[in-house]
Amino acid sequence: MHGLLLAGLLALPMNVLAHPAEQHASNVLSRRGVDIESFRLPLKAKYMDSDATAQKIQAMSFSKDDDYVSTATKLVKSTFPKSTFRVVDDHYIGTNGIGHVHFKQTAHGLDIDNSDFNVNIGRDGKVFSFGNSFFTGEIPKENPMVKRAFSDPVKALKGAVKALNLPVKSDNAKAKTAAGKEAFEFMGTTGALSAPKANLVYLQKEDGSLALTWKVETDVGDNWLLTYVDAHNSETVHNVVDYVASAEYKVFAWGLNDPTEGNPTSIRDPWTDASPYTWNSDGMTKYPTTRGNNAIAQDNPTGGSTYINNYRPQSPNLIFSYPWSPTATPPSSYKDFSITQLFYTTNRYHDLLYSFGFNEAAGNFQVNNGNKGGRGNDFAIVNAQDGSGTNNANFATPPDGSPGRMRMYNWTTARPNRDGCLEAGIVIHEYTHGLSNRLCGGPANSACLNALESGGMGEGWGDFYATAIRLKPRDTKDTNYSMGAWAANNPKGIRAYLYSTNLQTNPYMYTSVNSLREVHQIGTVWASMLYDLMWALIEAHGGTYSADPVFRNGVPQDGRHLSMKLVMDGMALQPCNPNFVQARDAILDADRALTNSANKCTIWKAFAKRGLGYGAKYDARNRTGSNKLPPGC
C-alpha cells in the first residue's frame, strides 16, 4: 500500500461566526428575483418520544416473531387503519441498535409526497419511538387515473420554468416514460445539468386539502429543485424543495480551522477503517489523483456541471504535496494545494461520521458499499474554486444512490482573495447538509428539511459539527467561536452572534425564532443550543481532543464526541421536517437508546438554558419558551 502524503491537511477544528448584518446565500433563484421562502409549506410532523410510545404500545399486540419492518408496519396500520401506504426501501439498523423504517402515504396508488411515517424499533424488537405527517383529511373519492383529466407533464415543466424563472429551455421538451408510476423524463431541453424529470403525486396543502401535482425535478447547479406544479393548472406552484443547501464560511485542515491556526503538514495514510479501500481507490480501481470511494475532488473554474474530465493533481506515488502561501494570488496559482485540501477534509469527515454510524445502510456517500447495505455509486463530487459563485459554498443532496455535490467558492472579502477550501469549517458545514438530509426521513427522502424551522436546523447542525471538530485542548466552556471568520475576513464571522455559553455574548433563546425568517438565522439559534449541550456533556464526561472517539459498548467516552453521536442519532429518530421541540426529544431518545438515559438531566438542563426546557411548545408564530426541568431532574 502506498503512503498518501497530504500537504496542509492536518486535523483542523472548524467554526463559523457571524455578524449582525448576516450574509445570505446567493443562488440562481434569488438572482432571478424568486423568493423560495414564499413556497415553503408549514411543519406538519408529530413525534411521539420513547416515554409516550412506551405507554401507547402497551395496548397493542406485536408478535415476538416479527422482524423490525413487520413490527413497524403493524404500528402504522394500527395508527391509521383506513390509510394506504407503502414501505420505503431504505430501512436499516443503526449502530446504536435502533431499526429505522420509513413509510409513504398513498392515495389511489399515488404517493402523498409530504405524508411520511417513521418508526424506530428498539433492540428488544419493540417500538421505540415514531413520528408522522400523514394526511388525516378526506381523500378525493375520484381516482384521477380513470378519467386522466390532469395536465400533460410537459406543461408542468414549462409551468415550473416560468414560475421560478429557471434557466431551462423547454420549448422542444418531450416526455419519455421512466421507471415508476406516472413518471417521466424530459428530452429536448437545455440549461439543466441533467434531464428534468416529473412524476404525478399528491401534496398536502396548507389549508388541509390534497392537491394533485406534478413533482418536477430540475438541477440547475446552484439549485436542485423539486417543484410541485398543480396538475390541473400549470401556472400554480404549491411547494418548492431545494436539494442544495448554502452556507457562509471557509477553512484549512483537520484540527486547524484555517491558515491562522497553523501550517500545512504532511500526513501519511490518514484513513481509518471506515475507508477499507483507502482514499485513492474504490476497491476496483486505484487512482493516482484526488479520487476514490468517498469523494472526487477537482478544479472547476468555469462553474460548469461536468467534473470527470476536470483538472486534478496527479501523483503516481500518491504524494500530494504542493506549495501554498498566504500571499499567493490568484487562488488558481495554488489550485493543487486547494484540491488536495478539499479532498482531505471531505474524506476525513466521512471517516469520522462513519464511526458515529453514518455508514452504507444509513445512506452515506460512497461508490462501493461492499455489500453492506444502502445504494452505492454516490460519492461526493467536490469542486474546488468553483467559478459559479463567490463568498459562499453549497451542497446538493439527492436521495441515496445519487452523488452529492459540493461547490466551494473563492472569497473576495480580502486581498488577496481567499479560497473557501482552506477553511475546514465551511467544508464540514456543507458536508453536514448531506448527513442531515440523508438521515432525517431516511436515505431515500432528501426533502425532509425543507420547512423554515427544519431547514434552519439543517444550517445549525452544520455549524455545530464545524465548531465541535475545531475545539482545542486549551478551550473551556468560556471559549467563544465564530463561523466563517477567516474566509469572510471578519473576526466576528458570518453569524449574528458568536457561539458561546454566555447569554450576554449570545442571547439567543428558543423564542427568538418567533422573529426570525431566514434559515441561517434560525440555524444559529439551534447551533447555540447544541454548543451548550456539548459543553454540558464535556463537563459531565470530560473532553478529548483526539481526532477520533474512543468507544465503549458503542458509546463515545468523552463529552465532545458523545454530543456529536447523540445529535446524529437524533437526526435518524426524528420525523420528516421536525421542529425544535421534536428534535430535542429525538436527542433525548437517542440518549435513552445509547446510554439508557444516563445523560437525561444533563441534556434537559442544556436545552432549558435557552428556553427549550420542559413545557416549551411549538407554534409557528408564537413559540412558548420554558426554563423548567422535568420531574426527576
From Swiss-Prot:
Q: Which Gene3D superfamilies match?
A: 3.10.170.10, Neutral Protease Domain 2
Catalytic residue list:
E430
Which GO terms of the molecular function aspect are on file? metalloendopeptidase activity; zinc ion binding
Maturation-removed propeptide residues: 19-246
Which residues of the sequence carry a binding annotation for Zn(2+)? Answer: H429, H433
SUPFAM superfamilies associated with the record: Metalloproteases ('zincins'), catalytic domain
Top-level taxonomic group? Eukaryota
GO annotation, biological process: proteolysis
Q: How is the cofactor bound?
A: Binds 1 zinc ion per subunit.
Write out the annotated subcellular location. Answer: Secreted
Which InterPro entries does this one have? FTP_domain (IPR011096), Fungal_virulence_M36 (IPR050371), Peptidase_M36 (IPR001842), Peptidase_M4/M1_CTD_sf (IPR027268)
What's an example GO cellular component term for this entry? extracellular region
Residues with glycosylation annotation: N410, N480, N622
Q: Which UniProt keywords apply?
A: Glycoprotein, Hydrolase, Metal-binding, Metalloprotease, Protease, Secreted, Signal, Virulence, Zinc, Zymogen
Q: Which residues form a coiled coil?
A: none
- Annotated Pfam families: FTP, Peptidase_M36
The protein's enzyme class? hydrolase
The cofactor(s) it depends on are:
Zn(2+)
Q: What is its EC number?
A: 3.4.24.-
Leader sequence range is 1-18
> What does the similarity note say?
Belongs to the peptidase M36 family.
Q: What PANTHER family does the record point to?
A: EXTRACELLULAR METALLOPROTEINASE MEP
Q: What does the UniProt function comment say about this protein?
A: Secreted metalloproteinase probably acting as a virulence factor.
Task: Write the protein's name.
Answer: Probable extracellular metalloproteinase 3
UniProt organism field: Trichophyton verrucosum (strain HKI 0517)
